[in-house]
Amino acid sequence: MRLTQGAFSFLPDLTDQQINKQLAYIVSKGWSANVEYTDDPHPRNAYWELWGLPLFDVKDPAAVMYEINSCRKAKPSYYVKVNAFDNTRGVESCSMSFIVNRPANEPGFLLQRQDFEGRTMKYTLHSYATEKPEGARY
C-alpha cells in the first residue's frame, strides 16, 4: 500500500529533475527547507527524524539536493521527505511537504475494529512495518 502524505503523493514518484524544480520554487519563495526521514509510516506520526540542520537562507537548490542525496544514501530503505517552512508573519508554517524516497516494499496497514459501548465502533490503524524493531522495518 503506497503511503500518501504530502504534496504529489498520489502521483508517480518524482524524478530528481522534478525534485530540483520544486526545490527551485522553494528557494524562489524564500522558504527554509529541511530533510526528514522515518521508518514508521503511520499517518499520525508527525515527528520524523531531522536529517542535519534546517537549511535557512539557502540560495541554491543544489544544497538541498545534496542533503536529500546524503539522506537517501544513508537511509535507502526509509521514507525521506522535504519540508518547506514559510516564516512570513501571519503564515509561520510548513507551506510545502513532499516525499522524495520510499522503501522498495511498503507493506501497508491493518485496520483493527473494536466494539464499544452503545454499539459504537472504534478503529485503529496499525502499520505492518512496525511489527519489526526500529531500524529493521524495511
Curated annotation (Swiss-Prot):
<comment type="subunit">
    <text>Heterohexadecamer of 8 large and 8 small subunits.</text>
</comment>
<keyword id="KW-0120">Carbon dioxide fixation</keyword>
<dbReference type="Pfam" id="PF00101">
    <property type="entry name" value="RuBisCO_small"/>
</dbReference>
<keyword id="KW-0601">Photorespiration</keyword>
<keyword id="KW-0602">Photosynthesis</keyword>
<keyword id="KW-0150">Chloroplast</keyword>
<dbReference type="GO" id="GO:0019253">
    <property type="term" value="P:reductive pentose-phosphate cycle"/>
</dbReference>
<dbReference type="InterPro" id="IPR024681">
    <property type="entry name" value="RuBisCO_ssu"/>
</dbReference>
<comment type="function">
    <text>RuBisCO catalyzes two reactions: the carboxylation of D-ribulose 1,5-bisphosphate, the primary event in carbon dioxide fixation, as well as the oxidative fragmentation of the pentose substrate in the photorespiration process. Both reactions occur simultaneously and in competition at the same active site. Although the small subunit is not catalytic it is essential for maximal activity.</text>
</comment>
<dbReference type="InterPro" id="IPR036385">
    <property type="entry name" value="RuBisCO_ssu_sf"/>
</dbReference>
<keyword id="KW-0113">Calvin cycle</keyword>
<dbReference type="GO" id="GO:0009507">
    <property type="term" value="C:chloroplast"/>
</dbReference>
<comment type="similarity">
    <text>Belongs to the RuBisCO small chain family.</text>
</comment>
<dbReference type="GO" id="GO:0016984">
    <property type="term" value="F:ribulose-bisphosphate carboxylase activity"/>
</dbReference>
<protein>
    <recommendedName>
        <fullName>Ribulose bisphosphate carboxylase small subunit</fullName>
    </recommendedName>
</protein>
<dbReference type="InterPro" id="IPR000894">
    <property type="entry name" value="RuBisCO_ssu_dom"/>
</dbReference>
<keyword id="KW-0934">Plastid</keyword>
